[in-house]
């Protein structure tokens, strides 16, 4: 079956979102601290940016002091082109350079996805939210 890594404090919310029954569908294999996950590689949910991969850097778990367990899964995706905290975390961890010239920006000036993200090309980022969520559930 599927394996998930999630914040213990968020398990009830996540189980509800995934329509899972804790007693019937869930087996907790291991309990870890967030710091235990730092440096572990993961498979990105979409492969749009594989050509930008930097082995040992991209798609590895990072640590950031602004990530909390009071909402979502307790894990945060980094988008350095769309937020100062993400940008600083990615620079600090060598994902992108400080000048940002190697940063991937798949959105145009109007806030629409470019051809780098084929299924959502031309869609405004907010219009694409539902489709992205649906695709993530698959």
Model segments located where?
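Non-cofactor substrate-recognition interfaces
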Residues: 1-138
């Amino acid at each position: 079956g599927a394996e998930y890594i999630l914040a213990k404090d968020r398990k009830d919310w996540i189980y509800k979102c995934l329509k899972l029954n804790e007693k019937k569908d869930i087996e907790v294999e291991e309990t870890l601290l967030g710091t235990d996950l730092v440096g572990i590689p993961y498979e990105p949910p979409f492969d749009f940016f594989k050509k930008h991969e930097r082995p040992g850097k991209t798609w590895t778990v990072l640590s950031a002091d602004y990530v909390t367990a009071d909402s979502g899964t307790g894990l945060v995706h980094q988008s350095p082109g769309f937020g100062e905290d993400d940008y600083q975390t990615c620079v600090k961890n060598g994902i992108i350079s400080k000048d940002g010239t190697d940063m991937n920006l798949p959105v145009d000036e109007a806030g629409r996805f470019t051809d780098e993200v084929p299924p959502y090309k031309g869609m405004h980022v907010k219009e694409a939210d539902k489709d992205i969520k649906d695709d993530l559930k698959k």
